[in-house]
Amino acid sequence: MKHSPLRPVATRCLASLWLGLGAWFVHAQDTAPEARTEETSQARYQSTYNTQQHPAFASAGASFNSLGAGADRMFTFSLTGHWGKRLDSGAEVYMNAELASGVPFTNNLVGLGGFTNGEITRAAGSTPKPYLQRLFWRQTWNQGGGREWLDSDFNQMARWVDKNRFVLTAGNFSTLDVFDDNAYAKDPRTQFMNWAHWTYGAFDYAADARGFGWGLAAEWYRDNWVFRLGRMTGPKRPNELPVDWDLLRHYGDQFEVEHAHHLAGQPGKLRVLAFRNRAITASFSDATAYLRSHAPASDADRQTIFQVRSGEKTKYGLGLNLEQALSPDAGVFMRAMKADGRSETYAFTEIDASLSAGAVLNGRGWGRAQDHVGLAVMDNRLSRARRQFLEAGGISYFIGDGTAFRYRPERGLETYYSLGLNKHSWLTADLQRLHNPAYNALRGPLTVYALRLHTQF
């Protein structure tokens, strides 16, 4: 499917209009005196434009699921409104609406385990399209232990809460809104861009193709501990947009334990997360057997996951997430997860074991308190079953280079510098270097350059 040029006129006009409105709104807001006042309603907005390009890279072969080896460009644009209201009962209701556009490399989301732009799942072509992103209810029951202040943020109204509390979230939201937080690597609009950095690469969390679902999540805050449990809907068919509403049979379950601590006087948090998915998916052993028993006449015949996608499968994963401040201006993070990888990807990306680690430094030390710089490395691997399928010449949903395949872990480095333009806008330059894209030693390395403009108020 072909798209119009990289920077369509409609997107540029929308971005300019949005930034102009943002400047007007910011001027009005900056005149108000600062005070610690609880919010009873909220209206916040963000805009992000991310353009990326890569030069040509080495390739010994390819299929329709391979990243194109020639020089290429891609972009994403998003414009989001976040609105919230506190009810008389103390509950909060939030609604988010988004306008998004974008075109991936190769005009298709293929050819990598760790994709290079976290916004690309929301894009559906060069023409901006609106959609309802979130609609959820949150109730907090305070249980003592002292008070703490929650700052105003997207989908969080400024307020006082008890340190010990129980929180229930229900409706349409993202699993990542509640689970797998990290101060240094969480938001691809402001921090690292690669999928394997802003969450666990192997976390096949239940969601539609845009990354959202319907469900419930409970959180119990107790002293330095937090316990979280949730169940979310997934797609009717793996990696697609329509929702499977049979939440009793097909679902994604998450359980997370978090502990806050101090190390050498600096705060940190350690999280352990387990997930379980149940859905109608293909097993890689069945797909490999089918491929070997039916001589493929074309690359399309090698995508045998579609021929054996029957019967319910259960998928498990376990991960460890660490964030640790080294000083008020510097911190490090690490995520590691292993999933069983016996069945195809349900809703995220094709990674079965992931390791990501890095550091972030604030620019206060050189007189740029609004700036920050980050550096991270990643290591993505496949399960034995998925690897054997690819080695047999199979083509999966996002990856598979056909017969020109020699397995190696997909490894990469990402670094960025985020320049604060004013109180509400940042311009980020980003560099990613990926070895063995889509786990194929016969392709790459791949270098991706990115420029991102983000505004929020």
Feature map (PLM): residue ranges:
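Short loop/turn motifs that connect adjacent beta-strands in outer-membrane beta-barrel proteins
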Residues: 30-41, 55-56, 84-93, 142-165, ...
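Transmembrane beta-barrel strands of outer-membrane/channel proteins
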Residues: 43, 47-51, 95-99, 168-172, ...
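Residue-level signature of outer-membrane beta-barrel architecture
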Residues: 85-87, 97, 139-141, 172, ...
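Outer-membrane beta-barrel "beta-signal"
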Residues: 133-146, 375, 445-457
